[in-house]
Amino acid sequence: MHHALIVARIARSPAQDIAGVFAASDPGELRHLVGVTQRSLFQFGDVYMHFIEAGAGPGPRIAKVTGHPEFVDISRKLEAYVSPYDPQTWRSPRDAMGRCFYHWERD
């Protein structure tokens, strides 16, 4: 399994509003295009963390679907709740992905 962690800033709105955006989207086509098998959303203060598990590295697949109507719709809806962690360096979704520097998995 491959993982990705997307990090951003979260507004002071209910986290359930963000969860609702993904709950409405997850039955659709987009998760299949990206290969998402699991999604978890976390909040720590004003930090939003979006953990994705996928069969293959999701980063390149996300980059390929940024123009897909479902991706555009989700992005538009999330603008009210989520903003780039560092707006000065954000250019694409890839800029919001954390870099894994340690991973352990049991045998």
Swiss-Prot record:
Transmembrane regions: none
InterPro entries reported for this sequence: Dimeric_a/b-barrel (IPR011008), Polyketide_synth_cyclase (IPR006765), Polyketide_synth_cyclase_sf (IPR038474)
Keywords: Antibiotic biosynthesis
SUPFAM superfamilies for the chain: Dimeric alpha+beta barrel
Pathway(s) the chain acts in: Antibiotic biosynthesis; curamycin biosynthesis
A Gene Ontology biological process term: polyketide biosynthetic process
Official protein name in the record: Polyketide synthase CurG
Organism: Streptomyces cyaneus
